[in-house]
Each structure stands twice: as C-alpha cells, then as structure tokens.
Amino acid sequence: IMTIRIGINPLTWTNDDLPSLGASTPLSQCLSEGKLAGYAGFELGNKFPRESDQLNQVLAEHELALISGWYSGKLLEHSVEDEIKAIEDHLQLLKQCGSTVMVYCEVTGCIHGEQNTPLSKRPTIAADAWQDYGNRLSKVANYCLSQGVQLAYHHHMGTIVETSEEIDLLMENTSESLGLLLDTGHLTYAGGDPIATFKKYQNRIVH
C-alpha cells in the first residue's frame, strides 16, 4: 500500500518571488496554521533557518516534516561538476533534515521574477540541444540519488520548461533518476492538460 503525505509550500503565507507579500507573517504562524490545517510537512521558504539543527528544532516544535526545498539550477551555464558543487550545501541540508526530494528548476535566463517582462521573452533550448542538457541533468540527478535525495524537476512559467511539449522533451532526454514535480497550476497556465501529463508520466512523478 502506498503512503502519500500531503505537504504545503509556505508561499500560501509568504512569497519568495514577491517578499512584500506576507512580509509581516512570522514563520511560527505559517507552521502552526499549516499543522492545524492537517498538513504533514512544509517545503522550505525564505523565513526558514538554513542550519539543520535549528531547522529540525523549529519543525519538531510543530510536529512537521521537511518535505523538500527549491533549488535554482544553473546547469545551462555550469559544468556537471560545478553544478554538483553548487548544489552540495542544499543537498546536505535536505539530507540532515530527513527530506528525500529536492525541487529543481533551471533558472538560467529565467524571467518569472520580472513582472514587467512578457512570457514571450522567456529562455528556450534549441531542439538539438535537449539531448546534451538531458544527459548532463541526469548526471546531476544520479549524484543526488546516490546521496539519498531525488531531484524533482519543477516545470515553471518563465523558464526553459514551461509547456507540455517541453515537459515531453525533458522526460524523453533524461534518465529515470530525474523525477517530475507536476505543478497543475503552472501547466494549466501554460495551456497544458495536467491530467494527460499525469497519465503519461505517473511513474516519474515524485512530488
């Protein structure tokens, strides 16, 4: 029998992309209200400690788990080795706090934080570059998995993986060590069909 835990991102209370939203809301309120609502855990947000002992203590006080944490990947401008080095501190924090999934999104050239830039200006990858990018991303995912943490790729508006077609290219060009985070909101906004994508990649959806 599969056990599924339901967690939440703190952007319901505070927003990392627009810090003014929820700026006055303390972390304790996010956690206590999340627990009261029945969630089993939280993803990281900008108000969370980044030292494992402190983070574990804060979560334990509310009987909550750390379910994941976003990482802004830059593999398009890094070598595999440099990306692994850059990711290491975040990876270790997740491990030390009992999380087995890392939310990963390629943000090189992204525009989702630029309110005055139209989505038509977002970065894209040429068709003949997907295989190389996928191979390199798979190597990063393999490393993280060897450390007990699976990468869950977050398709996101304003980035290189936004549409259903780009999710297809990502999945086709990466190994199964890379999981998929299915964000139904982002995919609907991009004009996709979340149900169809779920059915197509349900064996790779990990978050």
Give the role of each language-model region.
Residues 1-100, 145, 179:
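N-terminal pre-domain/capping segments
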Residues 16-19, 111, 189-192:
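A short, acidic/glycine-rich surface segment
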Residues 53-54, 162-166, 192-196:
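Generic recognition of short, well-ordered alpha-helical segments
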Residues 56-63, 168-174, 198-202:
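Short, surface-exposed basic-aromatic patches at helix termini and helix-loop junctions that form
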Residues 65, 177, 204-207:
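A general structural signal for well-ordered secondary-structure junctions
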